[in-house]
Amino acid sequence: MPHDPLRSERLEALLADCQNEWEQLAALETYLEDQLEFPLRAVCDVPPEHGSYGIGEGDRVTILGFLEPDKRWGIMVRVRKGQRVYRCPLFRLKPWKSAGAQQIAVDDYRTWFNAVGLPEIVDPEE
């Protein structure tokens, strides 16, 4: 991810009133909803996690829209690869040949997710 000297200022302003990671995720989701226009071309530049199907590193996809956030993977998007449609965590995707504002917004989210992320969910029944 290219260094953006204003990224920390943007994230600080966006997240200033948030009390925890879940509130930060909600604030970032609102920010992304304002910045992104679908469909949006992207490339996957993060290897898949165990149990992740369909989208591999280097795959080019079209982001079709947002899905409900996931407690482990954060903001989820619906993507098309060829004729198939998949769910994919947004942090695995980088906009490709898109407007600068869209690239900046996704890079802001990816920076936050990789630095802060979401707390691990502990299942009380385990």
Can you name each region flagged by the protein language model?
Residues 1-104, 115-125:
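Basic/aromatic-rich interaction segments and small domains that mediate binding to polyanionic partners
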